[in-house]
Amino acid sequence: MDLNSYLAVIRPETALLAATADEAGLDAQVPTTPGWTISDLVLHIGEVHRWATAAVTCKATKLSQVPGDFLGQLPEPAGATAWLRHGADALCDTLEGADLAIEYATFLANPPSPSLLFWARRQAMETTVHRVDAESSLGR
């Protein structure tokens, strides 16, 4: 898959996750991730989107170079799904504008090249998996 194919997954899957979170409520338990609530899923995806955005934005070649303050302030519950959507938009905008020639840091010993596609693929997968998890809270 190419970058645009991954980007075509991230935004809509995030929108579906946010809609499911709004429908289920942030306190709903998630059967496929025991001990987690919808709020936990929303915060997790929002955090990993921001982490990937920071890794690409700072052109880190080692994960230790990613600034530790990439999260900013966590959202109040009423703003959690808007915060989630905003993070996905920032991630996609960052990936779209990034240089494919740079070998960005990843957490794999031998990542595929170009490593920008690693981040796009990973975030598409992560978002999709947790969107499905969120839907399990509604019995889907």
Label the model's feature ranges.
Residues 18-25, 96-99, 138:
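A structural signal for long alpha-helical coiled-coils and helix-turn connectors
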Residues 10-14, 49, 88, 92-95, ...:
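Hydrophobic faces of stable alpha-helices that mediate helix-helix packing
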Residues 1-4, 45-107, 139-140:
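Short, helix-capping/interhelical loops that line the mouth of catalytic, cofactor-
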